[in-house]
Structures are given as structure tokens and as C-alpha cells.
A protein has these predicted regions:
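Rossmann-fold scaffold of SDR-type NAD(P)-dependent oxidoreductases
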Residues: 8, 81-89, 112
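N-terminal Rossmann NAD(P)H-binding glycine-rich loop of SDR-like oxidoreductase domains
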Residues: 11, 15-20
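Conserved glycine-rich Rossmann-like NAD(P)H-binding loop of the short-chain dehydrogenase/reductase
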Residues: 23-43
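Rossmann-fold cofactor-recognition segment
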Residues: 47-65
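Glycine-rich NAD(P)-binding loop of the Rossmann-fold in SDR/ketoreductase-type enzymes
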Residues: 62, 100, 107-115
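Conserved mid-core segment of classical short-chain dehydrogenase/reductases
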Residues: 89-106
Length: 126
């Protein structure tokens, strides 16, 4: 059985390490659909090492319309994912609770939770 992994936040250190481990010695029909946001250059070495097994997508998960467009592209151009790994997050900013940033919190919630729900609804079987 061919595995297709959909990995959001794939350009993170964790995402790239996971992709390396998944594709190292994997069957040739293994495919990773890797989402990043403005930083796909980080995937260049993996794309070179695993030609045909890694497709990259530059998608801003904080924008619901872009998330919806992304799942439409996946539905049209990629096999249905057998696995979904959701890793995106804003960079950590340590701050005192007194300096809590509601706007940043809402943005992170959109990226980490709302996008996951929208993508899962689109790619997981009913």
C-alpha cells in the first residue's frame, strides 16, 4: 500500500526531520505533501534527495480562504492522504502574562486549531 503523508508546518525543524525519517529507505511510491509558509527554500535539500516523493505547498494557514484553496488543490492534484501530521505554529515568544497579546493568540489559534479542523474535514474520509 502506498502511503501519502500530508504534513503541515513541514518546514519546521521537526517537520524536516520527520520527512527525512519517513522517506529514508521508504518505497518509491511513498509521497509527502509538505506545507510551509514563505519558507519553502528550507525544503530544497530534501526535494533534491527525494525527487518525486516530496511536493511542497506555500500556504498561509492563518487565512481561511487560503486554507480552503489549499484543500481544493490537494483534492484535484494529489492522492488522498493516508496520514495527516499537523505541526504549524508561530515562533515561541516568551512573555509575562501581563503583556498577553490577544491578537497573536488569536492568530496562533487560527494556525494551530482552525486550519487543522478545515483541512481534516476536507481530507479525512466521512
Amino acid at each position: 500500500m502506498a502511503y501519502t503523508y500530508l504534513i503541515t508546518g513541514a518546514t519546521s525543524d521537526v517537520g524536516r526531520t520527520l520527512i527525512e525519517r519517513l522517506l529514508h529507505n521508504a518505497p518509491a511510491d511513498t509521497l509527502v505533501l509538505a506545507q510551509g509558509c514563505g519558507d519553502l527554500a528550507k525544503m530544497a535539500e530534501l526535494c533534491r534527495r527525494y525527487p518525486g516523493q516530496l511536493r511542497t505547498y506555500d500556504v498561509d494557514l492563518s487565512d481561511r480562504a487560503k486554507v480552503d484553496a489549499f484543500v481544493e488543490v490537494l483534492a484535484a492534484d494529489a492522492p488522498a492522504p493516508t496520514h495527516f501530521i499537523h505541526l504549524p505554529a508561530l515562533p515561541v515568544v516568551n512573555t509575562k502574562f501581563k503583556a498577553f497579546d490577544q491578537r497573536r493568540f488569536d492568530l496562533d489559534l487560527e494556525i494551530e486549531v482552525h486550519s487543522a479542523v478545515r483541512i481534516r474535514k476536507a481530507v479525512l474520509p466521512a
